[in-house]
Amino acid sequence: RCGKSYLLFTLFKNYLIKQGVKEDHIIGVNLENRLNKSLRAPDALLQYIDSRLSSDGQYYVMLDEVQMVSEFEDVLNSFLSISNVDVFVTGSNAKFLSKDVITEFRGRGDEIHVRPLTFREVADFRDDYSQDMIREYMLYGGLPQVVLENDVNKKVSYLEQQMEHTYLRDIKERYEVRQDSDLSELVDIMASCVGGLTN
């Protein structure tokens, strides 16, 4: 929700092309896209990428939401031995926590955190700097889709949806939480105490 896919498939791809990389040497797969469902099987993904590689020049493989591939660690490890392939991946849920990735690929990759927009970035983007902008940022945060949305109801709806379908679901899956109501109540209590003294 912070723009990882846009950063990878648009900005980085355009950068590579400007550097002289041929488009057929950039292999991108959005694994969240239903059209690519068959590529979520590790062997199918390996075969698809391998069929597009040759020995001429450097290749750049971009896999978005790689945690949707079962045994994705094995898939990524398969490309480590190929000298003319660089692999870039994104992931965004409990199955793809950075500490797990660091453990699995220690010394064989770099990690880049993509965070929501800072207030300065929002202020630079918009030309209506005011106290209202500060209040709005403090209330709704800096997720790009929220910043771009003008309708308050749509902002709230989007944030509620993210909380329920992204964060809470990931916590439930990762830690096998069975009492949904207890988790929701805990989150409500913690959210109401932000910035306040707790005992």
Please annotate each region the language model reported.
Residues 119-199:
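Interdomain hinge/linker elements that couple catalytic modules in large macromolecular machines
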Residues 62, 86-92, 113:
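Structural recognition of the conserved hydrophobic beta-strand(s) that form the central parallel beta-sheet
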